[in-house]
């Protein structure tokens, strides 16, 4: 892989999406591509489709990767994977990795606590998935040292924002999944939800 130096590698000004792959299918691909487009517009990276990132390109990358790699577990079932798309001024990168969240981990449950680091709800960066991820990585490492699986970020008003590596969803009737920008509850606004 030949990656060129640009503002992403110097300042974290790049966008990414990590997409769950279950049984060879990309989960919420279109939603991820829309979110990547929003971040690319915000960071002035050019539109992903014009840079070679669209539904067809992502599906082709996955198909090619699956044809070249053994993606089945010992029982013959497809492993859960994650496809990551990274977009910077000068780079477009696709990568694959195993999804570390196994059935055993889900059955055990996740231990988490609240981070002392606060999100700045006035910063436009908190509304986009950017490569500027230092707080998340350091807090994830600290959570592991404290015996936790995850840490939750609050903003300066004490409202729930996100996890270090996870998104937070609110479910209504188990069919309707809402992130903070889609939630209709009066308790939630564009900057979080009160604890």
Where are each of the predicted segments found?
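Short glycine/serine/threonine-biased micro-segments
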Residues: 10, 161, 186
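A short local loop/turn or secondary-structure capping micro-motif enriched for an aromatic residue
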Residues: 102-104, 170-171, 184-188
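Glycine/small-residue-rich hydrophobic helix-like segments
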Residues: 177-195
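Glycine- and Gly-Pro-enriched alpha-helical subdomains that act as flexible
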Residues: 159-181
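Residues at secondary-structure transition points
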Residues: 18-20, 169, 194
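Conserved alpha/beta cores of soluble small-molecule-handling proteins
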Residues: 1-152, 156-157, 182
